[in-house]
UniProtKB/Swiss-Prot annotation:
Organs and tissues of expression: Highly expressed in young leaves and at lower levels in roots, mature leaves, stems and spikelets.
Protein name (Swiss-Prot/TrEMBL): Probable histidine kinase 5
Modified positions (4-aspartylphosphate) in chain numbering: 942, 1091
PANTHER family referenced in this protein's UniProt entry, alphabetically: HISTIDINE KINASE 2, TWO-COMPONENT HISTIDINE KINASE
Organism: Oryza sativa subsp. japonica (Rice)
Residue intervals on the Cytoplasmic side: 197-226, 553-1187
Pfam family for this entry, one: HATPase_c
Gene: HK5
Amino acid sequence: MSRVGECGGGGGCGARRGKAAHAGAGAVAGFLGCLLLVWAMGGCGRGCGGGGGEGVRDRVEEVAAQFNLSMSKLQALASLLSSPERECICKSGTINDDNPAHSMPDMSNCRLKNKPSGGNQNRLDNVIIQDCCANEDNYDKNNHENNLLQNAMQQDIGSPTTLWNQNNALSFNHGMIFSLSASLGIVVILVVITIFKRGKQANELCQHEKLLQTPSVKISRKWSKRALLLGVLVGLCSSVWIFSSMHADVVARRIENLENMCDERARMLQDQFNVSMNHVHALAILVSTFHHGKNPSAIDQKTFEDFTARTTFERPLMSGVAYALKVLHSERELFEQKLGWKIKKMETEDQSLVHDYNPEKLQPSPVQDEYAPVIFSQETVKHIISVDMMSGKEDRDNILRSRATGKGALTAPFPLLKSNHLGVVLTFTVYKYDLPPDATPEERIEATLGYLGASFDVPSLVERLLEQLASKQKIVVRLYDITNHTYPTKMYDSDVIASDDLHISNIDFGDPTRKHVMHCRFKHAPSLPWSAIMISSAVAIIVLLVGYIIYATLNSLEEAEDNYTTMRDLKGRAEAADVAKSQFLATVSHEIRTPMNGVLGMLQMLMDTELDTTQRDFVVTAQESGKSLINLINEVLDLAKIESGKIELEAVRFDVRDILDNVVSLFSEKSWAKGIELAVLVSDQVPDVLIGDPWRFRQIITNLVGNSMKFTEQGHIFIRVHLIEEVKRKMEALDDTSPENIEVTANSKNTMPYNTLSGLEVANNRKTLESFRMFKDSSDAIDSVNLLVTVEDTGIGITKDAQTRIFTPFMQADGSTSRTYGGTGIGLSITKRLVELMGGEIGFVSKPGVSSTFSFTAIFKENRKDPGDIKRYCPEPTPPDFQGMRALVVDGRCARAEVTMYHLRRLGIQCDLAATSESALSALLESCNSSVKSSLNMVLVDKEAWGEDSGLAFFRCLIDLRLKGTLKSWQTMPKFFLLAGSITPADSDCLRLAGYSNSIRKPLRLSTVAACLSKALGVGLTGRRSRDNSLVLRSVLTGKNILVVDDNAVNRIVAAGALKKYGAIVTCVDSGKEAISRLQPPHKFDACFMDVQMPEMDGFEATRLVRSVESKINDTIQAGEVSSEIYGNKAHWHVPILAMTADVIQATFEGCMECGMDGYVAKPFEEQQLYSAVAHFLEADATDPLT
């Protein structure tokens, strides 16, 4: 109780010291978790992603600088050069950054190779340009077009900017995961620290108890909660800041994504347009070379048409290509005569939409300085042949700009012929010869031969591009020509209603005089920022949770502080009550046992007088009542000692079989009176001597057997002891029988339906055994002996509702149990506690109205000393005369026969079993006709071998066989013994008439079996030392001077009478002071019995003074200062002092040993206890009266 109080107080005192710091630490931890979340979410995500993007861009710039390429051209090459197309590109020169249109290389072949450089997969591969030849046959047109568009799609996804965004997003996700894990980890660590601190504070009670009264405690409470509130507010503000920061990041990333996607589309459209422009330039070179450079011309309409049809895959974005020849007015008539058609003008000058365009209906071109009639065209625009391109305003301006600058020129958007789409026309000029870069416009106009034009369907171009992009559904694209800022022309539009976000990307189509832009918007409105909401909410929840935990902890600690004073008072009261209870038990036990000692002592002295039968019965009844009261007191004291933890187990050597024989002897009279068969069986595998507490082991078995005897009116009580390992093996071999029941099946003549000791049904305890811990995991100690003890009865059983409280102190099955059967209900509770102290378990199984079986386990140690040492612990050594004898056990009930054979084997007798009369007769006939070595020495027949009095009938059958001449040698017949639980005088006459040598009364014990066999066989008596305690006590105490010290006159009379009964010379004194004066050396006393509790001076103090005097005298004798003759010629004085008290608790016994006493005798005296106490000191001087 004191320890409980200290722990309870410790929680209050220790908590006050670190409570404020604890709350502040919790708030700081929560705030640090929030900051960690923000850092991991923002800084790490952007830092990691941005670092990766910058590294990729640096490597791309290195490659661009190495090959003298601009970033836009390098990206155009990457998008253009798909796997099959990488076989075709030029070798001559580099691409001009200023004007991609004039950087058209020759139609030579080149190839890109990937050169492994290690490191990041996103870095741009090194480009190696190698010479090779162009070969159109190596192309697959369809695959080329598909690869070109697929490469454009991959460029959209895999460009450095996009990769940077993906790395950024991935790093952001990792940061979020890391931050959430870190925050949850902080919460878990905080909770663990809280629990650890609260446990640690319980150990600081004694060091901080004074803090409770200091005023700083209340101040600490107030500031702790204020700090907690501040921490929670900071955490909530942090969650709001996290939300706003993450939401701003989401918006910024959305805008950034829009910018990236819009710029990617604009760049891809520009790159694809530049590629097409290069192909148009190549056609211009083709016309210049093979049409104007050859005479006659190598190209006609058919050739041009076939060539452009077969190379359409090179110009997937163009709707048509045509070549117009420069014709002066002076050359018009000759030209028209040569070609056979008139030069026609365009229908309208403003290039309005023309549906169902028909060249036959066009008018001749009006007279002007020069004309540009179309002479070659692609099949798709074959209807424009003979049309004068100079007759249209947009086309005329386009031609004039192109031939003056030498570069490609674009028209303003206009409706294409035979379509409703807006388009543009790209015009390149074909010159007579190569002009220097610094040629003047006049020189260029003079060298002009014709014009190659290509029309682009802008809506189809944009749609085709967007279809190849995985993210085309995310944004809406519009394309404008803003050359005229006041009235921009919409070249491409979408009908989808887009969001408010807008990004504008510039597009350069190679004509510096025209400006184009792309407007991009998200198709859908932004969704809710769920990541920001969830993370900020999680932070807020974590902050509130941590705050609640700390708040609850503070409240709990405050409650502990408030209850500390009350707990301290209760602790003091509990300690006082505990002391009072112990003192009460000691006092009550002494005050009750002291008069009971007188009562029982006087009754014993009365029994030694001449009494008639009635008077003797009265005295015996009074003795039994007194012993019952003593036993009740012992049980209450045992329970008190167990509950207070003051009981300790001994570790001495003992014989299990001898203890069980003593228990059987104790209950023999009751078993005879009730007609119950009581038996014990110990497995041969159980060691002969064990190390443990024999008294507590005997108490457990005595309680269980006494409980069974109380509730059993017929049948049997069977005690069995086995090793747990042995039972486990049998349980594995036998599935349907009791684990310890190994008997063979009974003969059919046995009328009892069950093969048990009495033939009645018993409860199977297999499930109980399987629940024991030792059956699952036996002890691995080398010298450990694990015993299983089973007490089986055929009593009334235990009801289902009472089975749950059977081991509860002072509880019985029902209210009538105590009135009907007696008892207090604490025996089984004590038994359970003692079994647990022995390291075992106890359980039971019961069938109401049938039987009950109690089983318990216990752990002992095996005695591993010399086997000859075992004899010291066997009170009744077996006579060697029985060794080698043979016995036949005749019993139809095998369980009962096994008990008989167990006791015979203890005597060294070999046993055979005959379960039927036929087998018994056969064994007898064989024995009579056999040699002396194999003959039987004895036959033990159970009185109820095959039914009531069947044992007597069996011997009569033998007499009939002898009269008939079947048994010829009657003189060689073995001795016959009858085993019976009760033998009446009539049965004794029947035995003599039947010819039995003797009868052995059950329950069987080693001593009774040995005595009966010895008397009948005439062995084991010669020279045998008698072990009768009364005779030994007389030999030990005769002539011995004993001093009895007790303040109670009745106790002095009882003690003196008990000692004088055995021949001792007794002197009595009534105080400790008188005892000291009588025991001053030299004195005549051989031993002293001293009461412990006496007025003026108790037995403890008196003993200490006696030992002090003896020690001084012994020191002087050993030092030679005095002669031993002065002290009766004794060189060493030490009188045995034995405590004589009714207080039997452990504390009293320890006090006796500490003060110098030599032994302990509990009141009232009993013969066995008295012998055990004095024999150790006085037996050496005694002589055996029988030797």
